[in-house]
Amino acid sequence: MKVTLFVTCLVDMFETNVGKATVEVLERLGCEIEFPEAQVCCGQPAYNSGHVEAAKEAMKHMIETFEDAEYIVTPSGSCATMFHEYPHVFKDDPKWAKRAQKVADKTYEFTQFIVDVLKVTDVGASLPGIATIHKSCHMTRMLGVTEAPGILLSNVKGLTVRELPNVQNCCGFGGTFSVKMTPISEQMVDEKVDSAMETGADYLIGADCGCLLNIGGRIERLGKEIKVMHIAEVLNSRS
């Protein structure tokens, strides 16, 4: 099975280990990975900031880059959601709306692809300790992926998963929201860190690097002892 990887900006610039783990897990599951070097940003930051025309240019480029893929997989619920929003963005342009729908229909978040397409629930990972899961807003509320991460983590050998209190609450990242509304964002991420600490977990695990960078940065500044990991890193662990 051929999988075309959309690596995302944050993985490319800050968390390359997540990209590596994503590839290694998928290859271990029998996938052949393709990586189009022409890929750029999905356009979400510009679109959410109101720069619609600039965002559309990036989106058109991404549609052209990925439309011939068999499956498109990304280690980000947020960016996968943006791909699924493309048809709505181009709803008044039939030509691009059709091409956008073609891309959206074969785009999957990493864990969603493993569980729903590959029909795998145990990837053979092992990681001793206690974990709690942060469920990102776009991934759960817009993409509708709520169960796949927990299903996969429940089968990681040695790992105990505890529910995160107030799991439905945003971590305060929200892309440019954390920059434009910093005091509010800081309060939100403080509450998220407090919730994570309540669980007594060794690891806070999520599927979006934006959230994890935000939460992890706050944990570091507060001097808390809990390790933040992307789920691809966990599923690639053989501890």
From Swiss-Prot:
Which processes are annotated in GO (biological process)? lactate metabolic process
Q: Which GO terms describe its cellular component?
A: cytosol
One GO MF term: oxidoreductase activity
Q: Which PANTHER family match?
A: LACTATE UTILIZATION PROTEIN A, UNCHARACTERIZED PROTEIN YKGE
What function is annotated for this protein? Is involved in L-lactate degradation and allows cells to grow with lactate as the sole carbon source.
Entry's family note: Belongs to the LutA/YkgE family.
Protein name per UniProt? Lactate utilization protein A 1
**Origin species:** Bacillus anthracis
